[in-house]
């Protein structure tokens, strides 16, 4: 039986409240929430964050445990890659989830991020592109020759 161990998430809850008070753009808020959850070593941090956000911000949506885990994964995916993070912040959450959950190479991920931002793709169109391998194998701005 799974029994929760007593953990003090007070600091994380304060941080989450401060993030939501800033009225950040959607992707900035998602990145910040993901960072706050990612900094906690406990396995149940995402679930605790989701429960806190749902209880304290009932007018806000999108804070299911699954979605908060995705926010944590989003932060971890781009925490050491500011170039890709800037691209990811230009598109919406739904498209970012599609790209994160697809099994793409680093180059393919960049190409998808660039194309999604440049062409303002729908989720359906992005899924078609990924499923049909219909994106460039190299990023749009990458030169043909590298010295």
Where do the model's predicted regions map?
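Basic, low-complexity intrinsically disordered segments
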Residues: 1-147
């Amino acid at each position: 039986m799974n029994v929760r161990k007593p953990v003090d998430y007070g600091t994380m809850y304060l941080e989450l409240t401060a993030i939501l008070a800033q009225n950040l753009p959607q992707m900035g808020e998602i990145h910040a929430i993901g960072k706050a959850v990612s900094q906690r070593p406990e396995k149940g941090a995402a679930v605790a964050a989701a429960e806190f956000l749902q209880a304290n911000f009932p007018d806000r949506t999108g804070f299911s445990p699954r979605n908060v885990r995705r926010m944590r994964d989003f932060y971890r995916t781009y925490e050491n890659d500011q170039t890709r993070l800037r691209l990811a912040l230009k598109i919406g959450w739904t498209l970012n989830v599609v790209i994160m959950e697809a099994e793409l190479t680093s180059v393919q991920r960049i190409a998808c991020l660039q194309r999604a931002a440049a062409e303002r793709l729908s989720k359906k169109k992005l899924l078609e592109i990924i499923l049909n391998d219909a994106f460039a194998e190299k990023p749009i701005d990458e030169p043909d020759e590298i010295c």
